[in-house]
């Protein structure tokens, strides 16, 4: 584990689950890290669509969505923490939303309903991914999982988040490292 003065910052990175991932919740996932600090980390799983679409979710929260192309956009499982709460990962915009976190790389993560109201009215971000829940790690927990070969890390590419079909995001994230899933092994060691 790095010393505190050697701390790495994994904000704006993809975490790619290795085959030996101990937690089945994260098996086969790609997580976009929105925040990573000495206090812990927060990320969103980007490749697990649920059976809920925007229309169903918006109906649940009393928002009228009339933009035809968005009706059947899936809502994603963002992680096992706060699964009843929505998290919207989107391109940074000139609009200011009540509760947004800017992420290096030109993205924002917003948790306030005003971003959903903007989407419903056609004035929201053009590219977005809506999740229910998020992934969270306490201080040192993610670093420990990485040191035990639970995750690969690579700088995130927003095109993978927004433009690649969900079922191809795992392989697309691995391709950023120049590898494919057929090259991964559950066995690992340290030199």
Curated annotation (Swiss-Prot):
GO terms for cellular component: cytosol. InterPro entries: AlgH-like. It holds the Pfam family DUF179. Gene3D superfamilies: VC0467-like. NCBIfam families: PRK00228.1-1, PRK00228.1-2. Belongs to the UPF0301 (AlgH) family. This is UPF0301 protein Bphy_2327.
């Amino acid at each position: 584990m790095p010393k505190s003065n050697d701390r790495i910052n994994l904000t704006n990175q993809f975490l790619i689950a290795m085959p030996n991932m101990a937690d089945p919740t994260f098996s086969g996932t790609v997580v976009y890290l929105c925040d990573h600090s000495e206090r812990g980390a927060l990320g969103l799983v980007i490749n697990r669509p649920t059976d809920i679409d925007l229309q169903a979710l918006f109906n649940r929260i009393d928002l009228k969505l009339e933009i035809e192309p968005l009706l059947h956009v899936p809502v994603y499982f963002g992680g096992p923490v706060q699964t009843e709460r929505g998290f919207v990962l989107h391109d940074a915009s000139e609009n200011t939303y009540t509760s947004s976190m800017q992420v290096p790389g030109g993205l924002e993560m917003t948790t306030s309903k005003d971003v959903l109201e903007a989407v419903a009215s056609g004035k929201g971000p053009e590219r977005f991914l809506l999740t229910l829940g998020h992934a969270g790690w306490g201080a040192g927990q993610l670093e420990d999982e990485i040191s035990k070969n639970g995750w690969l890390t690579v700088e995130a590419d927003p095109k993978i988040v927004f433009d690649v079909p969900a079922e191809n995001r795992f392989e697309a994230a691995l391709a950023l490292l120049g590898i494919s899933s057929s090259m991964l092994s559950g066995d690992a060691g340290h030199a």
